């Protein structure tokens, strides 16, 4: 009987990808990012192995929301205290923390486990066009 094979742990050989979020629809962009973080495009994909790539997102403040989501989409934050639930619209979130819009969309597309928390540490989101990871020579993804 043949034993099932497991993909090797990538170690330091993870790839780096650069995505420009300018004028990209948020959900479609988040799918591409989540698939790169999970390595779902890899032929040796295994959901229990953290073998994904690093993803750098620039121009997060200029991501596009369709329909009336700019005014109607609701983000919540809870402090842990009574009456500590705060609500923010997408327009407010874009003004205060434009990186969190993309991070929360990608988080919603990942499994809720410890591997997903590790994957989220490999997501680097920047509000403007500059990023601090030029030394890694990221490969540009065009959407």
Where are each of the predicted segments found?
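C-terminal structural segments of small proteins and small subunits
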Residues: 110-132
């Amino acid at each position: 009987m043949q034993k099932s094979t497991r993909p090797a742990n990538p170690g330091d050989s993870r790839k780096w990808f650069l995505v420009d979020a300018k004028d990209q629809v948020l959900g479609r962009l988040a799918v591409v990012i989540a698939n790169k973080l999970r390595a779902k495009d890899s032929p040796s994909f295994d959901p229990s192995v953290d073998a994904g790539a690093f993803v750098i997102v620039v121009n997060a403040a200029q991501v596009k929301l369709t329909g009336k989501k700019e005014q109607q989409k609701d983000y919540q934050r809870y402090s842990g205290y009574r009456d500590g639930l705060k609500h923010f619209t997408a327009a407010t979130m874009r003004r205060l923390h434009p990186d969190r819009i993309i991070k929360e969309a990608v988080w919603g597309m990942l499994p809720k486990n410890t591997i997903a928390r590790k994957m989220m540490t490999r997501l680097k989101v920047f509000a403007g066009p500059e990023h601090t990871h030029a030394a890694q020579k990221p490969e540009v993804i065009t959407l």
